[in-house]
């Protein structure tokens, strides 16, 4: 199985600031990388698919980049509602595996 690694398990940033969350794959996943957001109430939403394509309804404050084995999610102009856990998933090879998640806390 392809191993997905998010080296930062938690981070905090201030309202209005920018954060970047990284994810690495144990082998080339050819840009088949998705980012999910899990809110504290358990709600899960797809944010970005195929590295950089924004899912319908997701604000343009969210963006993704990367290639081969290294990927990132950037959130600009942080809002209180961005407090959540963000996880990457590779969709290149079954089973489609997830990173361990990065929990983001927003400082007022």
Swiss-Prot record:
Residues 35-49 are annotated as: Framework-2. Residues 98-107 are annotated as: Framework-4. It holds the Pfam family V-set. Keywords: Adaptive immunity, Disulfide bond, Hybridoma, Immunity, Immunoglobulin. Residues 24-34 are annotated as: Complementarity-determining-1. Residues 1-23 are annotated as: Framework-1. Anti-2-phenyl oxazolone (PHOX) Antibody. This is Ig kappa chain V-V region NQ5-89.4. It comes from Mus musculus (Mouse).
